[in-house]
Amino acid sequence: MFDLDKYLADLILNCQSAFGERLLYMGLQGSWLRGEAHENSDIDIMVILDGFSVRDMDIYRRILKEIGFYEESCGFICGKDEMKCWNHLEVCQLCQTTKDLVGVLIDYLPPATREDEINYVKLSLGNLYHELCHRYIHADREKNNARFRGTCKSVFYLIQNLHFLESGHFILIRKDLKEAAAEEDRIVLELADLPDGYNFDQAFTSLFTWFQRAFARIERLE
């Protein structure tokens, strides 16, 4: 049985032993942080080193294999210099969805503004809207049905950030966001949990309409 606390303790200890003072940061992300994980969920860990090489990746992979649950291991590792040059648009999302385990993440990120957060939402909104419309036109009905709920899961992060911009409150957990979000957002959040045999036309129209309204909402924030 998987024990998250033991796994994190083992991972931190092994990384400290392998990288020493070069280990600047470790953080937990994803479904285990949100309390939404199941037995086979990815274990998302973020790692920042002072200097980063291919050899460091080999070492980190070896550590992950040695402590177990390698197939579930996931996340991101990079160097301090790369992190300082990271896209400003992603800074808010990173800070709000990462729990510090070793070090403080904000110390290694570039500065970001509210405008950056708005542009992050606009970019994400446009990408997902394009994906939705492109697939509707260029893919068959079966593929549209199969992938629709996956797109709805990605919309969670959009609504999470849009709600933050509109209310000032970043809500990490899906269940809590459903309770706090506007009715139109709540309806879309529930689309990801539709059962097999759902009414695709009705669900697609709901999501398509939500996207169009979301573009107008983000414009009002500027």
Where are these regions (language model features)?
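A generic fold-level signal
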Residues: 21, 38-40, 86
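Soluble or luminal CAZymes and related metallo-dependent hydrolases
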Residues: 3, 7, 56, 206
